[in-house]
Swiss-Prot record:
Role this protein plays: Necessary for formate dehydrogenase activity.
Domain of life the protein comes from: Bacteria
Encoding gene, per UniProt annotation: fdhE
Protein name, per record: Protein FdhE homolog
Protein's organism: Serratia proteamaculans (strain 568)
GO CC annotation terms, alphabetical: cytosol
CDD domains with a match to the protein in the record: FdhE
Length: 309
């Protein structure tokens, strides 16, 4: 099973059919007021004594720029039609493969560039200049390449900036959904029920959803529930193993599946309440190297590190 978003008017009929399993919140939308500033803070903390410290600090600057760009470029959008179509077809309402993008994300990119310029070193400035000079058509081609995972068509130096703007755009749209929709169970649980993208990592929460695992979308920043002890990629339960660099009590582990040969990191807030889906994944690339040595392929993509980067 997976999660499907339905229009608000369908809630009454669904409540009559509710089960115990459905009392678990199937979908969590991001708190955009603090998401990017918290991510930037976490990245800076993790950069200390980390071999990838310089890149983590760069990622922190980009996350901070996202925080400001979000504030400076509010979005108003009626998603009623998209919700109705998604509910009828069983597809995500903000399906990245077919959703008609507006040029709002171009404005977000311009804001990101303006925020990053004052601190950017020369090699980053050259990339920002190139992106700023790109036509709308060229930007859309770059976006298509990233969203379709055709990474050979976009330079690895441009990818994080394009994705940062696209992610902001999708996160803003996702933030408009909660008052109009809820989630129910369906199929294709390995994909985000909001936009159809893939996770960056998974988080076992504390608080009101304590002990529950949620996959964190690498595009729209939403999180969706997937039960533990089940592969998030193929849903098998037979051959799961958990790997860590430090000890069994590590806050970041890799969950590997012998059936499909993939792995996804799992972050435990009970071990460290400050873990963050994107930051802690990026800061533990040594664990990725270990998993590759063991013959497992990563089933996720970090928005700061695309294949070929």
């Amino acid at each position: 099973m997976s999660i499907r978003i339905v229009p608000k008017e369908q809630l009454g009929a669904q409540r009559e059919k509710s089960t115990t399993a459905e009392t678990i919140p199937p979908l969590l939308f991001a708190n955009l007021k603090s998401l990017y500033s918290r991510r930037a803070e976490r990245l800076r903390k993790l950069a200390t004594d980390n071999p990838l410290g310089d890149y983590l600090n760069f990622a922190a600057q980009l996350a901070e720029a996202q925080h400001h760009a979000l504030h400076d470029n509010p979005l108003t959008l009626d998603l009623t039609e998209e919700l109705q179509q998604g509910a009828a077809s069983g597809k995500p309402p903000l399906d990245l493969s077919v959703f008609p993008r507006s040029e709002h994300w171009h404005k977000l990119l311009v804001s990101l560039i303006a925020e990053l310029r004052p601190q950017a070193p020369e090699h980053i400035l050259a990339v920002l200049d190139n992106l700023e000079k790109a036509s709308s058509h060229e930007l859309e081609l770059l976006a298509d390449a990233l969203l379709n995972q055709d990474f050979g068509k976009i330079g690895s130096e441009k990818a994080p900036f394009i994705w940062a703007a696209l992610s902001l755009y999708w996160a803003q749209m996702a933030g408009l959904i909660p008052g109009k929709a809820r989630a129910e169970y369906g199929e294709h649980r390995q994909f985000c029920p909001v936009c159809g993208s893939i996770p960056v990592s998974s988080v076992v929460h504390i608080g009101t959803v304590s002990g529950l695992r949620y996959l964190h979308c690498n595009l729209c920043e939403s999180e969706w529930h997937v039960v533990r002890i089940k592969c998030s990629n193929c849903e098998q339960t037979r051959d799961l193993n958990y790997w860590s660099l430090d000890s069994e009590l590590a806050a970041v582990k890799a969950e590997s599946c012998g059936d499909c040969g993939t792995y996804l990191k799992i972050l435990y807030q009970e071990k460290d309440p400050q873990v963050e889906a994107v930051a802690d994944d990026l800061a533990t690339l040594v664990l990725d190297a270990k998993m590759e040595d063991e013959g497992f392929a990563r089933s996720s993509i970090n928005p700061f590190l695309f294949p070929g980067s």
